Structures are given as C-alpha cells and as structure tokens.
Amino acid sequence: IMQPSPPHEAWEYTVEHIAINAVMAGARPEYLPVIIAAMECLTEESTFTHMMSSEGSFTLAIMVSGPIARELKMNSGVGLLGHGWRANNTIGRAVRLSLINIGYLWPGEIDMALIGRPSSHTFYTFAENLEQSPWETFNVGLGYKPEDSCVTVDTVMGGIGMRIYGGGVVEPWDVKQVLDSIV
C-alpha cells in the first residue's frame, strides 16, 4: 500500500489499483514497473501537491533512463511526445488515469489549472536518448550504475509562453517583455 503525503494521505492505493488503470490506458504488462515507479515518485509532497493543485498549467515530465527504456521500445528521439509511441503514451496515460481514479484529481476540484494542462492525457513521457547524448546518463549522474533503470518525475511548465491571469485570461509573452521585467 502506498500513501501520498499531506494533504493527500486520506487515500491510499495498491499495485492492483495501478494495474487496473494501466489496463484501461492500454499499457502492456511489462510497462507496469515504470508506471509503479512513476506513481511512487508522486507520493513525494514536493512533486504532487505543488503541481496538481496549482492554478498554473504545470504538467508532469516522466523520464525513463536506463536499459528498460530500450526494452519497452520507448521513443527518445524525433516525435517522442507525439502519437504512435505506445509505451510513451500508455505509461503516461496510466499515471494520469491513476491520479484521476485513485486520487480524485478532477479539473476544477483538486486540479485547479486555469487553462488546463498541456498533454494532460499522457503527460510528457519519454526515454532518455542514450545513443545521442554527449553526457553521462541521467541515472549514472544520480549515482546509479549504467545497467540500472530509473524513472524520474518532475513538474515542468506546460511548454507555452503565456501569462495567466485570474479568470483564465491569457496573454502571450515575448523575450522583450521578459527582459523588461528583469531590468
């Protein structure tokens, strides 16, 4: 049984609950360890509470590093956030369905994003590009061995350049506006 941190400790979930949502998402059984690892990451208060209850349009980035990404045929290159990549899409979708069905994360109730969350159906789920990266792998940078697989979940701004005002009014920004606000 896994329990999220405050204020979400009122609900708890099991691997069975996650597996049910994974099946609904169309995930293959071999994806389950990655989905469970992502859900375990979300039990940390700093990730879960901030992103999920924010009025900003943050979204989750779920990065898989290590050999499991290749085994699951996750995309780490061109189009990695696009359609057609079953592992990427269904892992992210299983996490999202788990948050909705187990954590009751309904828009306008707990999920308060004013304009929604980009990629909220699948989040930004991708594999680290081990073949083309000139740097050491992310999992090695965290102190793991190259043969270890890791799942990292973090919040990212939804990839849009907009200011959000009360009531959902938005305004696009440009570089000059950003620099003017700094100066």
Describe each PLM feature range:
Residues 1-74, 79:
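N-terminal core-entry segment
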